[in-house]
Structure formats: C-alpha cells, structure tokens
Amino acid sequence: MSQTPSSLRDLEHHSAFVERHIGPNDAEIAQMLGVVGHDSLDAMTDAIVPSNIKSPAALALPDAITEEEALARIRAIASKNQVQRTFIGQGYYGTHTPKVILRNILENPAWYTAYTPYQAEISQGRMEALINFQTMCADLTGMQIANASLLDEATAAAEAMTLAKRSAKSKSDTFFVHDAVHPQTQELLRTRAEPLGIVLRVGTPDEAMQAECFGVLLQYPDSFGHIGDHAALADAVHAQGGLVAVATDLLALTLIAAPGEWGADIVVGNSQRFGVPFGFGGPHAAFMACRDAYKRSMPGRLIGVSIDAAGNPAYRLTLQTREQHIRREKATSNICTAQVLLAVMASMYAVYHGPEGLTRIARRTHRLAAILAAALRSAGVTVGEHFFDTLHVKAIDADAIHAKAHAAGINLRAIDSEAVGISLDETSTRADVVALAQLFGAQADIDALDAATADALPQGMRRTSAFLQHPVFNTHHSEHELLRYMRSLADKDLAMDRTMIPLGSCTMKLNATAEMIPVTWPEFGAIHPLAPPEQSAGYAQLIEELEAMLVECTGYDAVSLQPNSGAQGEYAGLLAIRAYHRSRNEAHRDICLIPESAHGTNPASAQMCGMTVVVTKCDANGNVDVDDIRAKAEKYSDRLAALMITYPSTHGVFEEDVVAICEAVHAHGGQVYTDGANMNALVGVAKPGKWGSDVSHLNLHKTFCIPHGGGGPGVGPCAVKSHLAPFLPKTLPNAGIRAGENQKAAIHGSGSNFGEGEVGMVSAASYGSASILPISWMYVTMMGSAGLRKATQVALLNANYIAKRLSAHYKTLYTGRNGLVAHECILDVRPLEKTSGIGAEDIAKRLIDFGFHAPTLSFPVAGTLMVEPTESESQHELDRFIDAMIQIREEIRAIEDGRLDREDNPLKHAPHTATQVSASEWTHAYPRELAAFPLPSLKQQKYWPPVGRVDNVYGDKNVMCACIPVDAYKDDVVA
C-alpha cells in the first residue's frame, strides 16, 4: 500500500482521470519498460522519436482536473446556450428521441464503442440495424437500393452530383440545381463542383426543362415547403441522357409520392428527424438511395446479405471494391467514416414506430401546419398552397415579425425582408400553433380550424404505395420488445465494452463515460444550427476553447472544426492548399505526391480537389523513399502542389527524415500535408506544425476520444499554418460564432456569400458535428498537459511491449531506430503461409474464438497484421491478446509439424459458433474443446460469434442489401 499523502492537494487527486484513462498503472509501466529495455517513459520516448522534431517544452495547457470539476465547467458553458422554440427548418427539425433508444443505443458503449464492421462475423448486430436503415430508406424513397449512411444531406447531394456525372449518358458538364434546394446544400455543391470542372446552373424546375445537363437536383418538398410535381421534368432530363437526383424528407415520404415512383434515379436526404436532435448541425445520418443499375457507383458503405460456412444467412460489407481503401484515387468517393451510430438510432426509431406510427407522426405534423396556415389566411396573411410541414409566409414585414418572435422566445426562418418560413415537426404542439398565429395577429381556435380545414397535400402527389412491410418494422412496438431486440443485436457484436480492438491506424482508445455525458444534454442537443447567434454562446465558447487546445497540441496556427470526418478534413486541407496556390497566380500547380503506403482516403481526396496523384516509393525499411520524393518534386517542380505523408508512417515508425522531406517539397513550391491519423503518437511529444508541415487533419474520433460508433460519427478538424488560414472552409453567415451576423443574413436563393478565392463549405453545418465536440473538450480538460503526454508515451510503450513479447513468435516487419516501433506494429505473417498454408485472414478469424477483434488486415502491407493497442489497455488485456497470438502460433506450428491437418484445422474453420461446437455430429479432425476453448481462461468468459466464416465471394456475386426474408433463416440457426 502506498504511503498516505501528506497534503490536501495530494488528497484532492486532480489527476484521477489520467489514471482511469491510461490502462497500466505505474508498477505495470515499470515492468513493461523492463521488457522493452528502458528505465523510464522519457528514456524510451527519446529512443523512439527523432530529436529534431521533439517538442522542447510541455504543452501550454492547464493541469488535469477531476471528472466532477470538468463536468461542472462544461455545464456552465452549456448553460450559456439558450434553448428556445425553433421553427426554422431548412433541413433540421425537432424530434423526440425515444428514451429506450437514448439509453440503450446512444448511451450504450456496446453500440458507440464498436468499430466499422469490416470484420463481418463479430458485427452481425449492427449490420442488421444498418440493413434495417437501408431498407427503411429504400422503401420510403421508392428506390431499389440504399447505402448505410453518408455524412449529411449536403455532402450526400454532392455525392449524387458526382454519381450522376459518372453514370449519365449525357456528355454535358452542367449540373442543374433547383433554386429551392436548401441553401447550405447549394453552397456545398459549389465547393465540390468547381475543382472537378462541373458547371452549376441554378434555376427553377421550368428552366430545368430546357437545360442541357448531365443531371438535375430537386428538393422535394422544397426548402420553402412546396410540394412539386416533377414527373414531366424527370422525363425531359432522361430524354437527353441525364439523371434526376432528389433531396427529400423521409417523414414527408410517408404521405407524399415516393421519388422513385415519378422518375428519380438518385435520392438523398437526412434521417435526423427520426429521433436525432439538432445538435447545432450534427451529427446526423444522411443517406443515398438509387436505382439498382447504379449500385456499383454508389459512395459509402453497403451492407449486403451473404452466407456463412454453414450456408446460413450472414451480413457483410458488400461491393467494397468501390471504396477508397481499395480503389484509392479511382474510388467513387473519399468517404470512410460515415454516421453509423446515428443511422442505427434512426433505424430503431422506424422499428419502434413502424409504418403506422411514422404515418401518425407525419399526419399530426401536417395537420398542425394546415391548421396554422388556415389561421394565418383568415387574418389575411399569404401562405403557400401545397406543403407538408413548412409554411412560406409572404408579403409581411419580416423584421417586425422576427422581433415579435424573438420577444416570445420563438425562432423563425429568415428568407427576405417580406417573407419568413415556419416549419412544424414532431415536437410541435397546439400551444405552439396558437403562439405562432398570434405573431401575425391571427387567432387559432384549434378544434374549430381542425374541423374546417382540409389537408394541404396536392391530390396527385399523395402516397398510395405501402412501405416498411418487413416484420422487423411491425413487431417491436412495445418497449420490452424493442429493448430485447436491441439487446439481442448488441450481444452479437464485439465492441470495446468487451475487449480491446487492436486495429492499427484506428486508435480504439477509451471513450470515457464522463466525456460522453454532456452529449445528451438539451443545452447542446436542442440548438438549431441556424439559430440566432446569441442563443449559441455556449457553443461559441466551447469551439473557441477546443480550437485553441488543438492549435497547442499540433503547433499550427488555426483550426476549422467544420469537417465531419477525417476524409473531409483531408479534403478541406487540400482545398486550402489549392486556394493558396491560386491566390498566388499558380493555379497550374496540380500534382500531389502520395507515398504508396498512404491511407486510401489520401489519393481519393486529392482527386476530388482536381489534383493529379503521383505515387512515390517506400524503401526496404518501410520508410518513404526520400530520394524518390526529391526526384519527383524536382521533376514536377512547376506543377507541384503538395505532398501528403502520414507521420508516424503507416508502417508504424518515426521516420528520421521528415524535416528534410518538408524542406525538399517547399524548395519546389509545394505544400506539405501531414495526415493526422497517427496523432496519438505525437500529442505532447512533437508538433507537425513546428517541423515544417503546412496542414493536417486530425481525427477527434481517434486521438481525442470521440467514439467510432461502429463507423461514425467522427470529426476531422483541419489545422493549418497562418498562410493557409484564410483558405479554411467558410461558415454560413448566421452561424453567428465568428460572423456576428443576425439571422436575417442567412443565405437564400442562388447567390453565393463566399468571396473570390475563399473556400466554400465542406459540411452542411458551419461547425459540422458540433454536438460531439464536448467529448474532446472533456478529454483534454481532464487529462491536462502532463496527462496528454503520458498518454502518448504509454501508447508507444504498449505497442513496443506487444512487439517485444511476440518477437519470438512473429516478426515485426518494420522498426525505427533502436529497434523500436511507434504506437503500432506490423506483424509479418506471410512466411507462415508458405510453411503452413495459414494466412493473415485465418489468424484474424481465429482471434474471434479468443474473443478479440482482429488487427488491421493487409494494410499497409498485404498479408500482414497491424496492431495498435492504445494507451487505454491494461497490461492484463495486452497479455491476454499476446497469449492468444502465441497460442495461435502454436496451432500453426502444429500444422507445420503435421500434428494438425493443413486444411481441417481450427484456423481454417474459424470462427466456431456455439451451434457448431454443440452439434450432435462433429466432423473435424481436431477436438471441439480446441475449437471453442483454446485457452483455459475462455471457459470463464467466452464470446460466441453468431455466424461462421462469411463467404465474401458469394456476397458480391449475389448482391442483396435489404432485410432478409424471414423464411431465409434455417430452423436450426440460433437467433
């Protein structure tokens, strides 16, 4: 037992959270350092990190504070936000999050700590929830296939534009945009279109009838509430070889005709109003649905149905060859992180309410809107004729109405000096309708108006087709049924509430409960992204403080929090470089050098910026080839725009020549982009902005503790040096935090508010996924300067401890100086395939039998496993993983020695299900006990995968991306 502290400061224990976040205690750290061969964390760090990049001083951040102190501070910040009655709409609507979903999905680490479902066998639960999401979106839109979420509606619309460009027969470069598309979507389309040489034309649907274009984007219902009949326009666009994209509202589609029924080819939208709060703009799960003919050109992830080794239905990610991690610059999109957790919430909202419940919510919302419209008309106010939930109120003194509304604690949409918008939603009440009517001098006798008022849906556009007929949407309507359904899905999966997830380059670290708590506070969740700025003062403070924290951690000068994924942060950073060159009359600089070991998002993002990717080599030691970079920088000197590197490298080492690399690129006029995916090895130790890098994106869902959510949400801030700061993404003027404009400055119509040379928006909301920023603020605040440095050092220690303890069994492919790795290590298992027939995939599947998610498979080197343990894993958990890997090596040795068959062995048939090992007949040459319990400890705590090894080839040949018919399940399959 330690000596009793002698001072009150010691007893107050302000660094308590640091000890909770970091897995090994000081005694374990000392023991592990002994294994690695160093006597202190500082000595080990000096042996790993090149001296010319190490930070000379500690981070200029406050000391650590306790969870309770941090929660009190952020509560005070949140209290500065003003929650008022909001009817702004414009793509964001009030909704009730069912409490059973709030507690058991959003607040449940079994869901929010999971990783992207690349390993199908341990992801069946969340993939079922996602295939429900896909089915929901496809059904409601009337399309044949939908994906498993995109980042927001505006980026989804941009993806629709590029899908249309790839797929349309028309050779036109023009994309026509309905002038009543949401303003934030129009702005983002401008950002995306210009680097790709796409010409945007904005106008009315009538003008679109005559336009020569490869595609059209319509808003349905439109941004001002009108429900148009666009069937004739769809026919006209198709006749000239173009495609029709539609941005829509899922709740409205329960009442109005599905876009797929009147000619749409691609449908996008936001599922936010299915149970997800405003959150000052995000995160929310967008979607894309399309005709089956375009499925291989869709962006984002698709969940499909395949079969497992026993022939039973099993889910998997399908058609992955479309994606950036495989096709790189030829990918359909740079999207990686999406919005899985929010898609799961939206899908459960649909499961809970079912088609009848959703229709009831929609009818009630529409009824209130129709009653309000009738009340306003009775007072002589002009209101649009056909609508679902949004009224376009015209011919008024808008300033006077806004003044009265603000005095009453009501937010309306600013359109122009003579018009306002009013959007009702699930949370709207009779009292709201009365109060809204009074703003215009009208009286609303709700019952009388209800009896006398007809619906405002156009007769020819009412929905008659059925939707959500699968039993999953018609079964779980009691809370017990939904609770048990969600639990059954969670039990099928492996997340960090059960085990470490040792994925290299993914940084699956602790997502502390204290960090998560503020996310569900209404002071953060109930703020509309376009609310008047005085109502978001708390967000203003939070964002300013978090940006300052990130500037200090990185050594850059400015940060944008707008990108809502790491890939979007990359895109923003490359756009900044592009705009910088253009501001210097060097628009011809279009070459982006990218090492062959780079993350797939790097070349995909460069391509989206209109850059030409030139690949550079890696040397035999896994480092980027400095000579090749110098040669290509010189060869393309006049055209060199940028070099993208990852540091520490994707090979898991600190390269010695990073400063020289930066100097070589700068000498030829290029800029250096450092991918921040591996920032967990740098915080408090080294700052990319100080060694010559010009820009980085960060992954707050890696380094700064936002959970991965099974594949999103994420935040990918873009951090830059001062010369690039003018080219960070712009914000909507009425976001208020910096612009200082009041709400009537909101953009509308077809004009852009961005000046010449500025970079437009990269996300729909000015501050992206703002409502999860408190997580990272809490992490930095509770860790403090010393805690952040220690976290980095322990991340380095844990990786080196694994590499050292496994060195007698597996070769670590690359090491840096002194034989050490960075925060991750690559285990080279390729020689084992030659001696035993066992490859990296077999080892990954066998780890499931030990209760582990696999390391990263075949990246950045094919046939290898990349392991990143993070600082949050205890020595006990590291040893458990090491023991599993050693046992697997012994099984491989048994194959090499002939004691196990090369084909009929536990690795080739892994993972093993409970159904399989308990069957009356066992046909394998190895015993059941070896299959199920390869280590004695597994008899105390065992994870059983719900399916056997999933057949990837079958899944890609037989693409099915909707809910499985009930009769497809065999009687003997365990639910």
From Swiss-Prot:
Species annotation: Xanthomonas campestris pv. campestris (strain 8004)
CDD domains: GDC-P
Named cofactor requirement(s): pyridoxal 5'-phosphate
Modification N6-(pyridoxal phosphate)lysine, positions: K702
UniProt enzyme class: oxidoreductase
UniProt-listed Enzyme Commission number(s): 1.4.4.2
Protein name per its UniProtKB record: Glycine dehydrogenase (decarboxylating)
Keyword Lipid biosynthesis set for record: no
Keyword Oxidoreductase recorded: yes
GO MF: glycine binding; glycine dehydrogenase (decarboxylating) activity; pyridoxal phosphate binding
Taxonomic classification: Bacteria, Pseudomonadati, Pseudomonadota, Gammaproteobacteria, Lysobacterales
A Gene Ontology cellular-component term: glycine cleavage complex
